Amino acid sequence: MHIINARLRNQEGLHELHLENGLISNIGRQTEAPTLGPDDLDAGGNLVVPPFVEPHIHLDATLTAGEPRWNMSGTLFEGIECWSERKVTITGEDTRTRVRKTLQSLAAHGIQHVRTHVDVTDPQLTALKAMLEMREESRHLVDMQIVAFPQEGIESYRNGRELMEEAIRMGADVVGGIPHFEYTRDQGVSSVKFLMDLAERTGCLVDVHCDETDDPHSRFLEVLAEEARSRDMGSRVTAS
């Protein structure tokens, strides 16, 4: 396959890209008008760039706005309440249908790498099971990383630790957290230490929702940073 009449960043003129087995094998400047083959793509003089990255999305909750009700306050915490009400109604098929539609839209907009947080504060882990299936189904479209995300807390949710560990055993790539949503500061600190232990033990990456609040006393970012520093895990840890 060839992509012809392509413009590249910081390059003059038009270029032709040669692809083999889904990868770019060669890029050359066009010196004459190329012939368009049946499997080729004419970029029409448009810019060709590497694929984009979606570093933070919640695919399990996509396309659910207004279900079962609208977030009338516009606050994060009412949004979480709305999702908790919607979450009890999800099924595997419901999740797969919404995720499939969203992934197609992402790919159509040039996104090839996706990191999605998936709520694992669900005794059945329904959304996670569906997302693991979608990761395989969509490999031809996107590279997907799945974050085991404890939306309702690790220490504050019944069997929260066990659900996190099970999510990683099932195939989640990244350990998540939400320390500011735990009931107490002590529980928030404990949740950070637990998730860092889990990531260190399993070799997973870390991506923690941290201090999403106007409360100036919410200071879990420094707890996470110190855990990352003391364990020499800085390059594996994201606060988002």
Where are the regions that the model predicts?
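N-terminal metal-binding scaffold of metallo-dependent hydrolase/deaminase domains
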Residues: 1-35
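Active-site gating loops and adjacent loop-to-helix segments of metal-dependent hydrolytic enzymes
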Residues: 62-95, 171-174, 220-239
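Divalent metal-dependent hydrolysis catalytic cores, especially in the metallo-beta-lactamase
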Residues: 78-89, 99-126, 131-132, 139-152, ...
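Short, acidic/polar
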Residues: 94-103, 156-166
